């Protein structure tokens, strides 16, 4: 009986030591859940087409070298596209394998596309080669300017996406519970361990009560007992 009780006490002490170390480890390594993280805003401005618009697409060009400004208002999405450029020295050019009496004007277009409703402006810069007739002095020639404006505005407004992403909360499996600041699984484990210790203690009391009459009988027995029977217990 003495050896059995010593072993039970040692087992209970080891269990309590292990539980204490687990509690300290869990409370020390537990981290709070991350809060909402605000993402960044990405605005992309596409570059103009590599091939560029064809030579029959032009803004308002005159024979003078003064700055040129043309504003085109698109009826589809009410987006205003403003073309601003400056003409340079005219040079002869050919078209369709035939020399024609025209002069070429290179216009550096600073295109500003203003998105309807938001007021957001997207800038696109491209070098566009346009032609103006030299026979019409001090006059203006516009050829298919309406086809150039929608192409550039669609690149400047449709692809200029603005996204502000709010990342979702990352779930934390070891998030502290409301009671005692410990994870829930730790509290459950500790509760089951204490329940097991209570059952072991109750079983010990039952065995002690069961063996009590036998101990009293051995102590009150008048028959001479052989000391060698208790040699291992003393």
UniProtKB/Swiss-Prot annotation:
Membrane topology: Single-pass membrane protein
Transmembrane stretches, start-end: 187-207
Subcellular localization: Membrane
Known glycosylation sites: 36, 56, 77, 96, 101, 110, 127, 144, 159
Record region (Disordered): 29-62, 116-138
Cleaved signal peptide residues: 1-28
GO CC annotation: membrane
Superkingdom of this protein's organism: Viruses
Keyword Transmembrane helix recorded: yes
Keywords per UniProt: Glycoprotein, Late protein, Membrane, Signal, Transmembrane, Transmembrane helix
Family: Belongs to the Epstein-Barr virus BDLF3 protein family.
Protein name, per record: Glycoprotein BDLF3
Native source species: Epstein-Barr virus (strain B95-8)
Taxon lineage: Viruses, Duplodnaviria, Heunggongvirae, Peploviricota, Herviviricetes
